[in-house]
Amino acid sequence: MLIVVSPAKTLDYETPLPTSAFTQPDFISDSAELIKACRTLTPVDIAKLMKVSDKIASLNAVRFEEWSTTFTQENARPALFAFKGDVYTGLDANSLSESEIEYAQTNLRMLSGLYGLLKPLDLMQPYRLEMGTKLENGRGSNLYQFWGSLITNKLNQELEAQGSETLVNLASNEYFKSVKPKELKADIVTPVFKDCKNGQYKVISFYAKKARGLMARFIIQNKISNVEELKSFDSDGYYFVEAESTATTLVFKREEQNK
């Protein structure tokens, strides 16, 4: 069973690491090509393209300039411990055991606008480049065109290596659009998390992101190997709703929070 999640905008390069192990990303030469395109942008260009503040634009202009094709423990850190957003709050990687980190290294992948696909222990230099960014590049006018089938092909290799035919999609729509379902040699299962608000159950972004991380953690800690076992997910009060689920979409609900 292979899990894919989105990256996070917020990064953490300060917290002590729970492991000294690391690996190298698979698409460094492709990332270097994107960095080359990014280096042609001024901070003003970046602010406009990425819809970010001048401060964030300036920071990322510096990051693009400082980015190197040599990844070391001095200029990078393992991706799983570098991302710090709602998904990663739920995943809480720093509290995973060594054996759980090893399991994640085989079964968890992070989609990325700059790096394509990251393994948990892949060294990652800091960046901001969301998958939906309309960055002109040598392969097209956006990152979906840039990555083409590369991410899907890599996922197929990973699935074949572990003898799995199931991909659990815990990524956002923006990121999962970088995967080509028709070319993927696996069944895609997408968990959907609905929270009750004012008597209605709906997907609330903040809660759903954290729930995706909780589900990833649940799979890693319990070494889940089939879809049936996913249905027993009950972290933070979520419960499986058979009546609203299908073979490819698993619906989980939770009662209203902060009453």
From Swiss-Prot:
InterPro entries found in the cross-reference section: YaaA
Top-level taxon in the UniProt lineage: Bacteria
Assigned GO CC terms: cytosol
Pfam families according to UniProt: H2O2_YaaD
GO biological process: response to hydroperoxide
Family: Belongs to the UPF0246 family.
UniProt xrefs under NCBIfam families: PRK02101.1-1 (NF002541), PRK02101.1-3 (NF002542)
Protein name: UPF0246 protein VFMJ11_2214
Species this protein is from: Aliivibrio fischeri (strain MJ11) (Vibrio fischeri)
